[in-house]
Amino acid sequence: MEQGTNSRGRPGRPKANLEIDLYSTPAGARAVENPVRRTILAALRERECTFEEIVSLAGRAKSTVSVHLQDLAAAGVIGSRPDPEDSRRKIFFLTGDLVASVLPETRVADDLAAYAGMYRPGSGDPFAFYRLAFRTIRVSLMQEGVLLDPLLTRAGEWLGEELYPAVAAPETGAFCANIARFWEEHRLGRIEVAETEPLVLLIYDCFECVDLPVTGKPACAFDSGILRALFSRHYGRPAEAVETRCYSMGFDHCRFEIAVEGGGREECRTPE
């Protein structure tokens, strides 16, 4: 759809001040730079919308919004269907997912080595290199202002689904203990249950963020996805792992509150 140019005017690396959202579609990845289109897609990520609702949210003339919708549809980012209450109207929806965003204000200007660290052969830790590789990729993207949180969350959810049988337990306390044991055995961090009503987990030495720059924002999208999938399976209904503290926010641990659909924060109890 839209492509950045480098300082010499050739297609390539985005301009330093360019904000871009990257969407996956059935036809491949699509980059969206135009702020009006980004606003439209942000609204559609929340829910499906009618044309009139999109016009109101975008704050642009109907003719302008219509052109943007046509281009987004042609790129395969959105689709539409007739409104069941009025066949003359259309309801618009996303056909893909937000994969990443390039946001100049989130660029990390510090030296990569300060956060990526060094690999020391013979350290005796078989997981050290893989943690280093994950951290280096993450910080390299942060230096460019690229946020992969949506993609990392979905990857975490997939992994959580695969992991669930290995940690499943009918009682919530035992379930949390199994998760903590798995985290420690695989050098992912140390998990403690800080509160039971609601259920709050603390993660120390978190593999995902312990060495990341302090940005003031949560950084554990991958962990959030894993925990979301695990507790959704455990409680038998959609759950969220809401990160309220993180190493990247200046804390010495990460803190997750487990929120379950229809019940707010979930208590640590045996599910009925």
Each language-model region and where it sits:
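Short helix-coil-helix linker/hinge
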Residues: R30-R37
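Low-complexity, intrinsically disordered Gly/Pro/Thr-rich segments
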Residues: I78, R237-C246
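Short alpha-helical segment immediately N-terminal to, or the first helix within
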Residues: A42-L44
